[in-house]
Each structure stands twice: as C-alpha cells, then as structure tokens.
Amino acid sequence: MLKKSLLASAVAAAALVPLSQAQAADYMIDTEGQHAFVQFKISHLGMSYILGSFEEFSGDFTYDEDDLDASSVNVEVQVDSLNSNHAERDRHILSEDFLNASEYPTATFTSTGFESEGDNEGTLTGELTLHGETQQIEMPVTLIGEGEDPWGNYRAGFEGSTMITLADYGIDMSDFPEAMHELELYVTFEGIRQ
C-alpha cells in the first residue's frame, strides 16, 4: 500500500506552479542540480509513517502573472525510481500487488487550472495519471522565492502538498488499516527560466 502511495505522490509532486513572475515565462524543473523533489508519506499500520521519494522525473511549467489561467505545468515520473530506503519493500511496492511498474512505468501530471489566493499562494488543479487511472486533483502551492542565481540563470521555487486516496487509482488497500488508504504527497521544485 505504501508503494502505491509513493507513485501517487510522485505524480502529484509535479503539480507545483510558479505563483509570481513579471511576465509569462517557461521554466524547466531543475532535477540535475537536485533542487526538486517528489516525496510521499504514508501510515505504517497506523503506528508510524513511511517516507519515500521518486528519484527520476522531469517537467516544465509556464507562468503568467497577468493571466494565471494561462499558467501550466507538466510532469512525468518514472515509477520504478521509487525509493523508501528499504529495497525489499520497494520491490513489493513496484510489483503487481501495488504500483505494477512493469505495466505502468510512468505517472504523469498535467495541469488544467490555477486559482490565485494572494500572497504567493494558490491552488493548482490538474489530472494525475497513476497505475493506469486518471483523476482530477487539487494541490495548494506556495511560491518560496525567485530571482537570479550566481550563474546568470533566473529561478523560481515552489512547494505544495495534497492527499491522495489510493483506491481512486485502482490500488486495492482493503487488506490494510484505513490509515494506510491515503498518502500525503509533498513536492518542492526549483525551475530555471528558459
């Protein structure tokens, strides 16, 4: 069950959208510099938590402060890059019992809308596809900061989190305690303006 939640969180992570730029601009999510993360948190039998991440993903976003409806984000996650710091558990999560990474090797997020809530905050909506199922999700996001880096690039960084119900993606958690039926997806991204 943890495995399934990991994938969902990875996809959801891609959903962060920049909240304030002077004009419309395209950004590439900086995964090479380890400035972007797709992480998840799921209950372990209602007694503690399992934390993990998806280590391979790519994406981009466009942001227009004057026309937020034109803002967009696209992310693709390699499901088999799941890492919960326990190799045997990871293999089980990636198996047919949960994420079935051999049949569904990628998870994707494509935004469909954004609603600004002021003070560098807003709610991103979009379609998350995981385990062959596509569902609409909402993720509150926050602009952490933006500006020029020491190498002459312009960057913007965001974070967001949301809860995902695994059964919505065809992942059967009925044999596990109810606390394990949902996972928290957390993402933080730095984008480099192109």
Q: Can you annotate each of these PLM segments?
A:
Residues 22-194:
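Low-complexity, acidic/polar, glycine-enriched regions of mature
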